[in-house]
């Protein structure tokens, strides 16, 4: 998630689009589209893109990949977003909470563990379809939350985002649908065992 602003001097919004607007209603959607084309030209696969909840807030979701390649793609993605915005005379920022009173931006990292072709997080016999490995993985994230947060929320501004009421992860807990937990487990869809994963918010 990121914001487009008219300049880098003040958080003056570029658009007033809404969450998942289907029709392009703003200048930001064209910038987002151009960014997607640039990423695809570099071999980075994009799964989804949409306007986010806050004014001038956008999201581009990359196709999952193995960890090191995903880290490289993420850095390239961030540079592409900022550079294409700059080329078009606007400013893009991944700052967690540039404006008071609206949702901030986070980097929600979807994670799973594979052994060969088998998703080690999936267990058909569990009510949540989560294996013991997945539950231990989640437990580890929750147990070491105060240590991990120093890496995932390294700026003072990061903590301005972590307040109740704005879909921010304010509870060291996990859930299926509650977006105020640190870890969210997307619902299992029959036939999609390989998609079993956790989302670190």
Language-model segment annotations:
Residues 1-201:
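Glycine-rich, acidic/polar active-site loops that bind/position phosphate-bearing ligands
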């Amino acid at each position: 998630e990121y914001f487009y602003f008219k300049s880098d001097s003040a958080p003056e919004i570029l658009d007033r689009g809404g969450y998942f607007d289907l029709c392009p209603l703003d200048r930001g959607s064209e910038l987002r589209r151009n960014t997607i084309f640039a990423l695809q030209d570099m071999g980075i696969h994009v799964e989804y893109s949409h306007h986010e909840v806050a004014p001038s807030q956008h999201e581009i979701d990359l196709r999952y990949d193995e960890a090191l390649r995903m880290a490289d793609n993420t850095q390239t993605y961030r540079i592409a977003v900022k550079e294409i915005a700059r080329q078009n005379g606007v400013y893009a920022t991944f700052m967690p909470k540039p404006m008071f009173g609206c949702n901030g931006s986070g980097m929600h990292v979807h994670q799973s563990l594979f052994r060969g072709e088998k998703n080690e997080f999936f267990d058909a016999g569990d009510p949540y379809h989560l294996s013991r490995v997945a539950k231990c993985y989640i437990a580890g994230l929750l147990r070491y939350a105060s240590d991990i947060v120093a890496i995932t929320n390294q700026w003072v501004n990061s903590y301005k985002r972590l307040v109740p009421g704005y879909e921010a992860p304010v509870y060291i807990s996990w859930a299926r649908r509650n977006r105020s937990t640190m870890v969210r487990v997307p619902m299992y869809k029959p036939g999609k065992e390989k998609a079993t994963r956790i989302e670190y918010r």
